[in-house]
């Protein structure tokens, strides 16, 4: 049995640390690297380190530990996670976290299934504040798993320093928010308010009447502040300078019956109440994913909404009003 599998070691520093600080002998180390320059750097540490460039070659091997930083392109990092879980007793990888907030793709479901009764901790952090020049559209995670683990999963937010415990990855938040009691209770309230209708009911192809032309994408997740996962415009339906009154026939829009309803909808979309609903699921710049809109309540479009009037209409308790106002950044005047 090999002792250590490393995903990605561009300068050979991980291999050097494993040998000098952890006592691994070079013969017990396998490094996946497909860049000849990186392979050369590793060989300068020791020519007895095994290097592979084909992930499939690992299927016949077994390791005590798998560590590293796999390729991030699309869901390729999950292929590496799955392979690591299949061939290693213990896994500790740094990679994108988007898969933790959703469960739509088969590879995401497979990764979570393999992590069941193995994952020990999930650490979320802003990779843009750690890796210079990076532009990650989502927080990074350090995913740690053991050969077998039956205890609660530790959920660590480096952005705030807070820790939580969940029993299963299905209990993970669905967006860039922390599962404290107040936030969870507000999310539950929004889910109750959107059982029969939501703002997504208005979204789609232009139907021929009045409309609000929100942009297809809005907000930025690239932020250098380690205390934030996104910029202040991330949880918005449109920018301050967006042209929402000019139709783009090939783009989705919000369809309403008349211009008064359109103006009412815009006043509502600007409120922190509506933007909190968007924040429950939004983890990318896309503004029209049905999942993102599914928990944004749809009020009557017969008036101009204000921050106070929408909270009063839905009878939001004062403590929850204060929480929503503090969680959603100021953006519109």
Model-derived features: positions:
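Signature of N6-adenine DNA methyltransferases within the class I
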Residues: 1-202
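C-terminal substrate-recognition regions of SAM-dependent nucleic acid methyltransferases
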Residues: 129-323, 328
């Amino acid at each position: 049995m090999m002792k250590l599998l490393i995903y990605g070691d561009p300068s050979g520093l991980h291999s050097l640390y494993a040998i000098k600080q952890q006592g691994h002998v070079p013969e017990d180390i396998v490094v996946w690297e497909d860049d000849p320059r990186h392979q050369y750097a590793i060989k300068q540490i020791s020519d007895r380190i095994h290097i592979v460039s084909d992930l499939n070659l690992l299927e016949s091997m077994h390791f005590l530990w798998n560590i590293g930083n796999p390729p991030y392109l699309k869901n390729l990092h999950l292929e590496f996670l799955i392979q690591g879980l299949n061939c290693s007793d213990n896994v500790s990888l740094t990679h994108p976290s988007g898969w933790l907030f959703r469960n739509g793709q088969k590879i995401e479901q497979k990764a979570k299934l393999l992590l069941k009764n193995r994952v020990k901790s999930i650490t979320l952090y802003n990779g843009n504040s750690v890796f210079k020049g990076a532009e990650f559209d989502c927080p990074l995670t350090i995913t740690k798993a053991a050969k077998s683990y039956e205890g609660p999963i530790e959920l660590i937010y480096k952005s705030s320093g807070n820790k939580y415990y969940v029993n299963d990855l299905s209990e993970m938040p669905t967006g860039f928010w922390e599962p404290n009691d107040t936030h969870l209770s507000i999310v539950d309230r929004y889910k109750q308010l959107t059982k029969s209708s939501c703002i997504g009911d208005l979204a789609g192809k232009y139907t021929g009447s009045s409309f609000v032309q929100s942009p297809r994408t809005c907000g930025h997740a690239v932020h250098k502040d380690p205390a934030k996962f996104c910029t202040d415009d991330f949880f918005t339906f449109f920018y301050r300078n967006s042209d929402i009154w000019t139709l783009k026939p090939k783009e989705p829009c919000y369809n309403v019956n008349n211009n008064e309803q359109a103006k009412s909808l815009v006043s509502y979309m600007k409120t922190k109440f509506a933007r909190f609903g968007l924040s429950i699921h939004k983890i990318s710049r896309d503004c029209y994913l049905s999942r993102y809109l599914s928990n944004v309540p749809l009020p009557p479009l017969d008036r101009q909404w204000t921050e106070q009037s929408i909270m009063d209409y839905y009878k939001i308790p004062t403590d929850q009003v204060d929480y929503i106002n503090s969680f959603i950044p100021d953006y519109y005047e």
